[in-house]
């Protein structure tokens, strides 16, 4: 089988295209396929905070596959064993949370690459990613088409950002606003002026280093700010949040507003 692996999301980052995404936290292939028909450039399947098993991730990758939206998987953490499983089920773009140091970044890079470039375990004959051994020269193609994104979301990570940006094999850095604002002493307040200043500066530093800069903004105004600051892959919503907002909005048409939650939501 002479199929060539491609990664349109990674190619878009290389070209500097702006790519708009959506967070998937509902854990179902049905919802993933609905989102995939909506036209988002990328869909983040969340395995960190949503209760997704590896098999759940697998089914959502299958559901998204026929459509143009590109899947990005965020595993619960960046261990070598878990990364191996997620790549074998067909993920080509990973977002690794809580990367605080350059050494952590190097370990993640190694876990995602086959030897001699890294330490990814070899098992193409049983992997969906290799079409069960039917893709010729799969290991070399996999190394080339992989897109690796890491999350900077703590004071420690901010201090080490320049070193993280120097790590070969990192394609982009994603700023985690919820954890970052909490780490900076502003829990549940990513809109605080000091947090905003730091986010803007980080985006500039990431792009200046030649890497892609990413962000999740459930507030459209914040999303527009990040795009203006130079972020080039931005998630503009979370499926579960959009669902609850729509449910509350519809109920408010028929019941008094006091009986419906009107609190402003943040991720």
Curated annotation (Swiss-Prot):
Site (Transition state stabilizer) found at 74
Please name the top-level EC class of this enzyme.
lyase
Residues annotated as binding substrate: 151, 178-179
Q: Which residues cross the membrane?
A: none
UniProt cofactor(s): Mg(2+)
Per the entry, the cofactor note is:
Binds 1 Mg(2+) ion per subunit.
Q: Which residues bind Mg(2+)?
A: 153, 179
What does UniProt list as catalytic? 49
Q: Which Pfam families match?
A: HpcH_HpaI
Keywords assigned: Lyase, Magnesium, Metal-binding
* The EC number(s) this enzyme carries: 4.1.2.53
| UniProt site positions, description: Increases basicity of active site His | 88
Q: Does the keyword S-adenosyl-L-methionine apply?
A: no
- Quote one Gene Ontology molecular function term: 2-keto-3-deoxy-L-rhamnonate aldolase activity
What do the Gene Ontology cellular component annotations say?
Answer: cytoplasm
For this protein, the record's InterPro entries field holds: Aldolase/citrate-lyase_domain, HpcH-HpaI_aldolase, KDR_aldolase, Pyrv/PenolPyrv_kinase-like_dom, Pyrv_kinase-like_dom_sf
The reactions it catalyses are: 2-dehydro-3-deoxy-L-rhamnonate = (S)-lactaldehyde + pyruvate
Asked whether the keyword Isomerase is assigned, the reply is no
Q: What family is reported?
A: Belongs to the HpcH/HpaI aldolase family. KDR aldolase subfamily.
Q: Which PANTHER family match?
A: 2-KETO-3-DEOXY-L-RHAMNONATE ALDOLASE
What role does this protein play? Catalyzes the reversible retro-aldol cleavage of 2-keto-3-deoxy-L-rhamnonate (KDR) to pyruvate and lactaldehyde.
Describe its partners and assembly state.
Answer: Homohexamer.
This one is known as: 2-keto-3-deoxy-L-rhamnonate aldolase
Q: What is the lineage of its organism?
A: Bacteria, Pseudomonadati, Pseudomonadota, Gammaproteobacteria, Enterobacterales
What gene name is given for the protein in this entry? rhmA
